[in-house]
Amino acid sequence: MSTTTTEKPAAKKPAVQAVPEGMHTITPHLVCAGAVEAIEFYKKAFGAVEELKLEAPDGRLMHGRIRIGDSMLMLFDEMQECGAESPLALKGSPVVIHLQVEDVDTVFAQAVAAGAKVKMPPANMFWGDRYCCLEDPFGHQWSVATHVEDVSPEQLQEAAKNACCGG
């Protein structure tokens, strides 16, 4: 005996991308004391474009997303009651965010004008980058570089020995 049904098979739900369009597999997610102000700083210093701001009921930023170059950066306000403390509350950060740019000197000048603290001014480095180090007003450490010279692995290893051990 055969049975027939008039029910249509369930429509397949379109597949979602595990890594959404515009995201990379690693995205920094910063805790800031003053995340809205941090977004404004990153716009001035690094040319960030604001993508999203979600405010918590108490007015703090619970999620912000900006784009710098081809990469996303997520951030939110410090929420110590949830264990989310900023570098300012922790008295520092062991993490450095690296930004690769077309013109390190221009970005360095913009960041300093926007309020970044100079940790190391731009200089040509043995690995082939013109490179600088900054601290933003929210306690996050940044390295910024422009690649200026290709260096072979052998040259790089020799230069690293000389740089670290005095030759």
Show where each model-derived region lies.
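Short acidic-aromatic low-complexity motifs
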Residues: 32-36
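Vicinal oxygen chelate
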Residues: 2-29, 39-40, 46-135, 145-167
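C-terminal catalytic core of tyrosine-transesterase DNA break-rejoin enzymes
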Residues: 138
